Amino acid sequence: MFIGEYQHSLDSKNRMIVPVKLREDLGEKFVITKGLDGCIYAYTINEWGILENKLKTLPLTNRDARAFVRFFFSGACIVELDKQGRGLIPQNLKEYAGIEKDIVSIGVLSRVEIWSREKWSNYNESDIDYDLIAEKMNDLGI
């Protein structure tokens, strides 16, 4: 399970240094892809396989299912960390997430989300009503 918030930066070669705690759980090789809300999702190889198997069951006749699978898989790539724990974020994902230099990685249960520091700050300053969300989660039995 991934938890916590980590602030760091890309180096001059667009590599991020994965924080040690996240690296321990992600492993030396993991998958990143376009996430929702303008961030990048990172999954362990095992978790990616589980997600892939679930998405394979979506009906090809459903337009929304096809669109989501295209979106999700078109941005996916495997990241292999070097001995210093650095991994390359491809240009297309940097552009998608608005990442220039400063990034925030957050643990969110089975995935890590990688945000530009600016987008993460804006997200946290938005008018999200967490009390209302908590009520809705309660209605779902959570």
UniProtKB/Swiss-Prot annotation:
Example GO biological process: negative regulation of DNA-templated transcription initiation
Subcellular location field: Cytoplasm, Nucleoid
Keyword Zinc part of the UniProt annotation: no
A GO CC term assigned to this protein in UniProt: nucleoid
Entry-linked InterPro entries: MraZ, MraZ_C, MraZ_dom, MraZ_N, MraZ_sf, SpoVT-AbrB_dom, SpoVT-AbrB_sf
Disulfide bonding pattern of the chain: none
Keywords, alphabetical: Cytoplasm, DNA-binding, Repeat, Transcription, Transcription regulation
Keyword Repeat: yes
Main localization (coarse): cytoplasm
Domain SpoVT-AbrB, residue spans: 5-47, 76-119
GO molecular function: DNA-binding transcription factor activity; transcription cis-regulatory region binding
A Pfam family reported for this protein in Swiss-Prot or TrEMBL: MraZ
Family according to the record: Belongs to the MraZ family.
Subunit record text: Forms oligomers.
Protein name: Transcriptional regulator MraZ
Lineage of origin: Bacteria, Bacillati, Bacillota, Clostridia, Eubacteriales
